[in-house]
Swiss-Prot record:
Disulphide-bridged cysteine pairs: none
A GO term from the CC aspect: extracellular space
Purpose: Type II interferon produced by immune cells such as T-cells and NK cells that plays crucial roles in antimicrobial, antiviral, and antitumor responses by activating effector immune cells and enhancing antigen presentation. Primarily signals through the JAK-STAT pathway after interaction with its receptor IFNGR1 to affect gene regulation. Upon IFNG binding, IFNGR1 intracellular domain opens out to allow association of downstream signaling components JAK2, JAK1 and STAT1, leading to STAT1 activation, nuclear translocation and transcription of IFNG-regulated genes.
Subunit structure comment from the entry: Homodimer. Interacts with IFNGR1 (via extracellular domain); this interaction promotes IFNGR1 dimerization.
The organism's taxonomic lineage, starting at the top: Eukaryota, Metazoa, Chordata, Craniata, Vertebrata
Localization per record: Secreted
Glycosylation-annotated residues: 39, 106
InterPro entries: 4_helix_cytokine-like_core, Interferon_gamma
Gene, per the UniProt record: IFNG
Residues bearing the modification Pyrrolidone carboxylic acid: 24
Source organism (scientific name): Equus asinus (Donkey)
Keyword Glycoprotein tagged: yes
Tissue: Released primarily from activated T lymphocytes.
Protein name according to UniProt: Interferon gamma
Signal peptide feature range: 1-23
Listed Pfam families: IFN-gamma
Amino acid sequence: MNYTSFILAFQLCAILGSSTYYCQAAFFKEIENLKEYFNASSPDVGDGGPLFLDILKNWKEDSDKKIIQSQIVSFYFKLFENLKDNQVIQKSMDTIKEDLFVKFFNSSTSKLEDFQKLIQIPVNDLKVQRKAISELIKVMNDLSPKANLRKRKRSQNPFRGRRALQ
């Protein structure tokens, strides 16, 4: 690698690093704006313990943690939806929603749309309740582990190893 290539690579790394730092700095600034608006640094906020942090500590595996995180993200989206008309904190909420979109949904618009559809479903609607109960068996089947299918496939070929030896 010649000197010019080295300088260009170094500049690219510096630019990418500083833009990431800038994005994180903007994100933290917006969280601080929300904390100030809600007076979230007040000592009485800690009364009764944390809202989410203790629950997150109890879940260790990534797949399990994703379940809890989805509920927490759902809470924040509902919170931001309730405050959508508040112009004082709108920019902060938009910045944080964008960061949630990138981190939780991997920038997938379709995942975000599906998630938002789910959190908007009215639980008290009788028609929705009937549909949900109608779909319950399929949902439960989708939740069950697929390991039984793999075991069944393996047990169907008992002579597979013997043929290779002959």
